[in-house]
Amino acid sequence: MSFAEKPFGVRIRTMGDIAERKFEERSVVDWVRYGLCRPPIDMSALPPELRYTPDYLTAQGLVEVQGLGQDQTLKVKHDKLEALRWWSKIHPVFLFVYDSHKDRHSLLSLEDLTKRCKESDTQSFPEGKPYFAIKSSLIWGDV
């Protein structure tokens, strides 16, 4: 069973762990943990700006970490992108993308991420939340 096929309750327990570990291993700058990591509160009750607090703080900017897998599609929720724009008013924002299927990573500025979102289709998760479906070819230039 692929990660995407597992029930959400199972996926949420490890969601982001692999990608965050890769960021910590591969970062060339000093960082500190910054964002919320599965806190024991109702996240849906929080405003998006708090819900999507970037994962790491560096002297160069805030870093949100997100992974993609076998389907080779980075799924960026619309409200997450808006929250990251809000954070960018305080400190530059970057997205560290880790592809666990091909063991590769990329660091995108918020400007680059926004451009790729505009070039991508909008789809929806089963619960109805819209997201930008960014194909890996828009990140790494592969076919």
Positions of the model-derived regions?
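Nucleic-acid nuclease catalytic cores
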Residues: R85-L113
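Charged, often glycine-rich, active-site loop that binds/positions anionic groups
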Residues: I41-D55
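Short amphipathic alpha-helical segments and helix-helix/interface helices
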Residues: E24, L81-R85
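Intrinsically disordered, low-complexity terminal regions enriched in charged/polar residues
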Residues: S106-V143
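Active-site-adjacent loop/helix micro-motif of nuclease/hydrolase catalytic cores
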Residues: G69-L81
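Conserved catalytic cores of phosphodiester-cleaving nucleases, focusing on short active-site segments
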Residues: S27, P54-Q70
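A structural signal for short, well-ordered beta-strand segments and their strand-loop junctions
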Residues: R33, L62-E64, F94-Y98
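Acidic-basic catalytic patches of nuclease active cores, encompassing PD-(D/E)XK
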Residues: M1-A45
